[in-house]
Amino acid sequence: MDEQSQGMQGPPVPQFQPQKALRPDMGYNTLANFRIEKKIGRGQFSEVYRAACLLDGVPVALKKVQIFDLMDAKARADCIKEIDLLKQLNHPNVIKYYASFIEDNELNIVLELADAGDLSRMIKHFKKQKRLIPERTVWKYFVQLCSALEHMHSRRVMHRDIKPANVFITATGVVKLGDLGLGRFFSSKTTAAHSLVGTPYYMSPERIHENGYNFKSDIWSLGCLLYEMAALQSPFYGDKMNLYSLCKKIEQCDYPPLPSDHYSEELRQLVNMCINPDPEKRPDVTYVYDVAKRMHACTASS
């Protein structure tokens, strides 16, 4: 069918709609057992659909990744190994990875559906209303985020892409850390083309210098996120900024202080400890989580 006649008959049904017989023996490991409902997101290398499992009715997010176009064989193997690690994570504040399989020449990842807003939407909402987020609310969400990251780090898994858009908040106020950074598996020629997609406000100095990512790089991002919840913008945000000046600001840890009349010394100090140019001097996630628990307890009761 040519494009024109296709257009006259309305949008084409995605070819991965299940036309196959159900495969109860395969569980979540085949497209035949899912009904695709609608596209809910797209990334640089993937598209995400809301879907329902036809076996048990569970709503899921189905992420389809162009694994063969964008990766070499080693990266594919590493990516699949990493997803197997993610499937072992089991925590109320981490988006659950149910299954992954290759079908129709794509990597399909079946995830818990985070059918709610995310932290970036909440920050925008407060900004629009010209109001700061109350400190007790900051700790209420941040403590859950720390709990999620502590679980991941204790299983030797790094997140690699902590930012407000990847922190989902359910209707009942439960934080779900999602979209774990698999981007590093894509070929360098692909990522080079995308290096300016989404300004890297959360990139640590060691990543700028390509010194590799480690657990302390997640802590840098955690500090940037705590700062953004308080200031309603990234510590390194600037209106008329190019990548070079952003990298300079990050290297020098050049960011405006948080207002001391609105936020506690503890919050401001924790931000400063996490946003430290030397990864060795940043605290580990257990320390950050302990501070968050203490502050959540004392602000929730006040």
Curated annotation (Swiss-Prot):
Report the PTM annotation: Phosphorylation at Ser-195 required for its activation.
Which residue intervals make up region (NTE motif)?
20-33
Q: What is the effect of changing R136E?
A: Decreased interaction with NLRP3
What are the entry keywords?
A: Acetylation, ATP-binding, Cytoplasm, Cytoskeleton, Kinase, Magnesium, Metal-binding, Microtubule, Nucleotide-binding, Nucleus, Phosphoprotein, Serine/threonine-protein kinase, Transferase
Binding-site residues, ATP: I40, G41, R42, G43, Q44, F45, S46, E47, V48, K63
- The organism sits in which domain of life? Eukaryota
Which locations, inside or outside the cell, does it occupy?
Nucleus; Cytoplasm; Cytoplasm, Cytoskeleton, Spindle pole; Cytoplasm, Cytoskeleton, Microtubule organizing center, Centrosome
Q: Which reaction is this enzyme known to catalyze?
A: L-seryl-[protein] + ATP = O-phospho-L-seryl-[protein] + ADP + H(+); L-threonyl-[protein] + ATP = O-phospho-L-threonyl-[protein] + ADP + H(+)
Q: What is this protein called?
A: Serine/threonine-protein kinase Nek7
